A protein has these predicted regions:
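Peripheral terminal and linker regions in Fe-S/redox and tRNA-modifying enzymes
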Residues: 1-299
């Protein structure tokens, strides 16, 4: 799994300290509920009927033993002794008093964890195959590509206020254990006849009240170009997705409404506008390729 750098650790600790200040001002009455609401949501805190709920990010479902023990400590000390793993590989605590929120965020930061982008209309936690890296039917390990997506999407300034939440799943196996057809974007890693690594790209999937499986928008996309292609899709959605109706704001509704023709015209146009970046992303010397080398196995 990806190993946090000194910068990464500094960032999550600063974010925890920032939330402590915001929470203290809210509890003191100097920061109103309307102002505090988006701030707590950006850190994974929901206010539900009986108690707050905290959603903790677990990128592509990987936890170290140290992180798991810290989560258990939070459950024992601040919750009711348990948490809930979600279908999208996050963890939720449902009974933490909000006054304990800052202490909990500090505990998470100690083990390189947080709740950033686990709620709100942004790109959510990147999910993958629960058996990634060990599955016997796996063509390519998807975890390095998940990490690239995680770093790209975290606090992306252009995609912080999308029409609706946006979910991405990646798999590199024959069996779709990541349920990629039911995500806003689904990515299937595989090798073509020439032995080249690439993605089959799906878009427009989703569950909820309108259940629609994703459609294939690119049969084979070279791995060096996958990030600029994903960015183009999200840009089209950010521009053309509905914001007037909460129930029709997901990308699946946009894909269904415009079909392939208009969406196909816009997405390549967006992709061409970023074409200068494609070559740099393909270079082994770029930071994107170094992400994979910074990922290693740990307990």
């Amino acid at each position: 799994m990806y190993q946090y750098t000194a910068f990464d650790r500094s960032f999550v600790h600063q974010r925890a300290a920032q939330f402590r200040d915001q929470l203290e001002r809210n509890l003191a009455g100097t920061l109103g509920e309307d102002e505090f609401r988006p701030l707590r949501l950006q850190n994974g805190w929901y206010i539900q009927r009986h108690a707050p709920m905290l959603r903790v990010a677990v990128p592509y479902g990987e936890l170290s033993s140290r992180q798991l023990r810290q989560l258990a400590k939070i459950a024992r000390v601040h919750d009711r002794g348990y948490g809930h793993f979600t279908t999208r590989q996050n963890l939720q605590f449902n009974w933490i008093p909000l006054v304990d929120g800052a202490d909990v965020m500090d505990l998470l930061a100690e083990v390189d964890m947080h709740g950033i982008q686990t709620s709100g209309n942004c790109i959510r936690n990147i999910t993958s195959d629960a058996l990634a890296g060990i599955a016997p039917d796996e063509f390519v390990d998807p975890r390095p590509y998940c990490e690239i997506l995680r770093q790209w999407s975290t606090l992306h300034p252009e995609f912080a206020f999308l029409p609706r939440k946006f979910k991405i799943a990646v798999t590199g196996a024959a069996e779709d254990r990541a349920a990629t057809y039911w995500h806003d974007i689904g990515l299937h890693l595989y090798k073509n006849a020439a032995g080249e690594v690439g993605f089959r790209v799906l878009a427009g999937g989703g569950m909820g009240r309108t259940q629609i499986p994703g459609i294939v928008v690119r049969e084979f996309l070279q791995w060096q170009q996958f990030l600029v292609f994903i960015e183009a899709i999200v840009r089209v959605y950010n521009r053309y997705g509905r914001r007037d109706n909460l129930y029709k704001a997901r990308i699946k509704i946009l894909v269904k409404a415009v079909s392939r023709t208009p969406s196909g015209r816009r997405k390549p146009a967006e992709t061409r506008s970023n074409s200068a970046c494609v070559t740099s992303w393909a270079s082994p010397s770029t930071s994107w390729c170094r992400i994979a080398s910074n990922s290693s196995s740990t307990d």
